[in-house]
Regions:
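Short, solvent-exposed polar/charged micro-motifs at secondary-structure junctions
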Residues: 190-191, 260-263, 314-318, 376-379
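Catalytic core of nucleotide-activated saccharide and alditol-phosphate transferases
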Residues: 249-261
């Protein structure tokens, strides 16, 4: 195990155990307890069970359930009177549960998850862009002078590369010097952390954060909320006061962009005459508020507030409760339709992958909010992921992307598997049109 990471995690774990008073306030404000069916449990007992799990005990079924369904909403953090981070506490509990398995099983599980993610990123990005454009996603070689910021993509946003291109276009227009880092080679280590393989997780995370420091940038702008939380809460606090302590600030890209609104506003010269609602997740503090501020600054755009549950930091964090996740998706689509929006805008890539194909069934477009900023600036990047996913036919998609398959030398069997699993397979709420097609096919002739 990476001893520095292990020691830091052990010390921070002890701080949680020492400082948590089991008041239960974090459990009481958690938005996931009702969907998980544990809202009526004694809060102090559930929290006490979580602490027992962290110590290596069995806890209780309710405590395990609470840890497993945590979606990282973050409402627990300001609620704690002892300044314990309950989101970190629940992450420690999940790690403790994973570490009941053998070290071999932990490593195998983490490696499998990493390989699956890497394959999806590699293939889907290449099915949308030629090699020359993909080079923009990873800065190579030393810079002559330190950049102002590192733009840290994380990994999975590269499956929807138009989002990354828009972010870089906006930074270019603002005149910000940056270095792009991300992809599996600069992973945050979260997949290994989730499997309990702390050796691999620490090694990967420390490699990436050391590379951030080597750029000399004073700020790292993280796109992905998973990376923001993994690095910002699980990794960097343990490096404080050590030789590896960061000399940079980690900030969510969207929050940074809102801080540059005075510079951004004059660049948004083209009216965007649309009613727009925002698909929100509260997990990373300030992101939704920042996105709304920016949308409200776009000329011609009418921002419409949509009723929606404040849960998770991205849609994929709701996966432990699939029925609840489907209801959340159905609810936001219905709210957008009721508000008569022209566009339902999301912030994050995972949400976009799961929701974008619903555009075929509803009277509004589903976009990333950066597309609206780009439109106001006269910048357009085609959302090829959405175009392909709306086809809903693996054979038709293969025909559409065959030129890029050949250009990148991809194996057809692998491409088909990724299309079926990673492109079409991520559909928590079935399309209404798909249900109609199924019903028609099964109707008696």
């Amino acid at each position: 195990m990476n001893e520095s990471f292990a020691e830091a995690l052990a010390a921070r774990t002890q701080d949680v155990l020492d400082n948590c008073t089991r008041c239960g306030r974090c459990f009481e404000v958690c938005p996931m307890t009702a969907p998980a069916g544990i809202a009526g449990k004694n809060a102090a007992d559930v929290v006490g069970g979580v602490l027992d799990i962290i110590r290596g005990g069995s806890g209780s079924p309710a405590s395990e359930r609470w840890a497993q369904v945590c979606s990282g909403s973050g409402s627990c953090i300001p609620a704690c009177p002892e300044a314990v981070n309950p989101r970190f506490m629940l992450a420690l509990a999940r790690v403790a549960m994973q570490r009941r398995a053998s070290a071999e099983e932990q490593h195998k599980k983490g490696s499998a998850a990493f390989s699956k993610m890497g394959r999806g990123v590699r293939v889907l990005s290449r099915l949308q862009l030629p090699a020359g454009v993909l080079k923009r996603f990873r800065s190579e070689g030393p810079a002559e002078t330190p950049p102002e910021v590192v733009f840290y993509t994380g990994c999975n946003v590269l499956k929807t590369p138009h989002i990354v291109l828009l972010a870089l276009d906006i930074l270019d227009a603002l005149g910000v010097s940056y270095r792009v880092m991300g992809g599996p080679g600069d992973c945050c280590g979260v997949l290994q952390f989730r499997s309990g393989d702390l050796d691999a997780s620490g090694r990967i995370a420390y490699h990436t954060t050391d590379r951030f420091a080597a750029t000399g940038a004073g700020k790292v702008l993280a796109w992905c909320p998973t990376c923001t939380i993994q690095i910002g809460e699980n990794v960097l606090p343990g490096r404080t006061g050590t030789p590896g302590a960061p000399a940079y600030d980690l900030e969510a890209f969207v929050v940074y962009l809102a801080s540059q609104l005075d510079r951004l506003r004059p660049l948004m010269r083209h009216p965007v005459m649309k009613r727009v609602g925002l698909h929100e997740h509260p997990g990373v503090a300030g992101v939704c508020e920042s996105a709304i501020r920016i949308l409200q600054a776009i000329p011609g755009l009418q921002y419409v507030e949509l009723a929606q549950p404040q849960v998770g930091y991205m849609c994929n964090t709701l996966q432990p409760l699939p029925a609840f996740k489907r209801e959340v998706h159905r609810g936001i689509l219905e709210a957008a339709a009721a508000a008569k929006v022209d566009a339902l805008a999301g912030v994050y890539h995972a949400c976009h992958r799961e929701l974008c194909s619903h555009e075929a069934d509803w009277p509004f477009e589903v976009v990333n909010f950066l597309e609206l900023i780009g439109e106001a600036m006269g910048i357009r990047r085609e959302d090829r992921f959405k175009r392909l996913k709306k086809m809903q036919d693996a054979d038709a998609i293969l025909v559409e992307v065959m030129d890029l398959v050949e250009l990148h030398g991809l194996a057809l069997e692998e491409v088909r598997a990724v299309i079926e699993k990673d492109l079409l397979g991520e559909q928590p709420l079935p399309l209404r049109s798909a249900r109609v097609d199924r019903d028609a096919a099964s109707a008696p002739g």
